[in-house]
């Protein structure tokens, strides 16, 4: 069964937060009671993503069919591909008072991101994000539901002619979202503060082989389509050969405190953002575990507000935001929702799904 959306408002915020943290308390014996670092023991993490669980047998059959030369019944429910990434992180930088202006949480991999990838690709309930379909919306227990049409976030079939983009905010150093989700979109822009970017680029380059479905071009990573050796008298380029589609992948600095897209003169400072507008018909902004204290909430929401206005008015893009929160402070979660809904006038939906509710995470769809 697909996830449902609970439309939150200034009254139901508190009901939602109370219920979610009550659920969390009831599962305290099953869930790790830590801050959410994926693994603090090592500088290099080896992580595998693969189909698993109750549908394992069915997925394995799909994998075997994919390897045949005949027509492929690509997944309509869950992804069939597996991925293995090697992530270099810096525990010492996390605890440093000198690195990146004392903003150091991005130097390690936090567990929200791997959980989100597994849920998005392999959970049957996340199918609307893979298929692009209507999702039931409720406004609380006393409200009849209606449906919200969602564009595809990830096209697993490769048959959809729509152009999709992902803009990642607060990416951190791991680079695992672009090298995995980049397989299913046309443009991916990964952003964070300037001090994070070199390690982010290193991890992306280390795991570039996981872009199994795409050829990757990137100005920031200095990646170009290779030229194939001449055959006879003809010069043939890789772009002219029937092969994988192309992913535009960029890494860029984006400071939430300084961004000002209302000033047209500053647009030239963000060519990567313009790339999304110029190449895509829909964009999902993805932000995983970026709301962990109250001081980040206003800069983050102001940035979303500017991005939404600019991308919709300039390029007429379909604009959606997915925010993943590791449920730590109930006060911070409540304040984030209050500000997003009441002060910044966003439409915010709680993604209601059993797999998520059995975790320490929550995901919100913002439009």
Curated annotation (Swiss-Prot):
Single GO term (MF): S-adenosylmethionine-dependent methyltransferase activity
Biased amino acid composition, Basic residues: 58-68
Binding site for S-adenosyl-L-methionine: 110, 170-172, 192, 256, 288
Catalytic activity, EC: 2.1.1.-
Alphabetical GO biological process terms: methylation
Family matches, as InterPro entries: Methyltransf_16, SAM-dependent_MTases_sf
Region (Disordered): 55-74
Job description of the protein: S-adenosyl-L-methionine-dependent protein-lysine N-methyltransferase that monomethylates 60S ribosomal protein L1 (RPL1A and RPL1B) at 'Lys-46'.
Record flagged with keyword Kinase: no
Keyword terms of this UniProt record: Methyltransferase, S-adenosyl-L-methionine, Transferase
Family membership: Belongs to the class I-like SAM-binding methyltransferase superfamily. RKM5 family.
Source organism (scientific name): Saccharomyces cerevisiae (strain VIN 13)
Gene Ontology cellular-component annotations: cytosol; protein-containing complex
Protein name: Ribosomal lysine N-methyltransferase 5
């Amino acid at each position: 069964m697909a996830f449902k959306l609970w439309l939150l408002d200034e009254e139901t915020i508190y009901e939602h937060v109370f219920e979610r943290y009550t659920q969390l308390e009831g599962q305290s014996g099953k869930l790790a009671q830590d801050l959410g670092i994926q693994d603090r023991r090592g500088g290099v993490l080896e992580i595998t993503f693969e189909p698993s669980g109750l549908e394992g047998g069915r997925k394995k059959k799909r994998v075997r069919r994919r390897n045949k030369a005949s027509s492929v019944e690509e997944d309509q429910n869950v992804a069939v591909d597996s991925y293995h990434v090697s992530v270099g992180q810096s525990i010492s930088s996390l605890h440093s008072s000198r690195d990146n202006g004392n903003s150091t949480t991005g130097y390690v991999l936090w567990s929200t991101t791997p959980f989100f990838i597994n849920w998005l690709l392999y959970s049957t309930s996340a199918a609307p994000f893979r298929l692009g379909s209507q999702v039931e919306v409720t406004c609380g227990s006393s409200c009849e539901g209606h449906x919200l049409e969602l564009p595809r976030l990830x096209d697993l079939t490769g048959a959809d002619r729509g152009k999709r983009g992902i803009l990642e905010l607060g990416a951190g150093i791991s680079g695992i979202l672009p090298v995995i989700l980049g397989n299913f979109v046309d443009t991916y822009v990964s952003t964070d503060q300037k001090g994070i970017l070199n390690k982010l680029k290193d991890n992306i380059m280390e795991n570039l082989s996981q872009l199994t479905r795409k050829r990757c071009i990137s100005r920031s990573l200095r990646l170009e389509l290779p030229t194939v050796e001449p055959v006879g008298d003809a010069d043939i380029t890789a772009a002219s050969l029937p092969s994988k589609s192309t992913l535009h992948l960029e890494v860029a600095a984006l400071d939430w405190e300084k961004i000002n897209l209302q000033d047209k003169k500053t647009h030239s400072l963000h060519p990567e953002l313009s790339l999304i507008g110029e190449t895509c018909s829909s964009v999902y902004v993805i932000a995983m575990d970026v709301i962990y204290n109250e001081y980040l909430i206003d800069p983050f929401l102001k940035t979303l507000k500017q991005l939404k206005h600019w991308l919709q008015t300039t390029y007429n893009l379909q604009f959606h935001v997915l925010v993943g929160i590791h449920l730590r402070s109930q006060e911070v979660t409540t304040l984030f929702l209050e500000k997003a809904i009441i002060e910044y006038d966003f439409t915010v939906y709680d993604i209601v799904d059993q797999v998520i509710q059995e975790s320490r995470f929550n995901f919100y769809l913002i439009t």
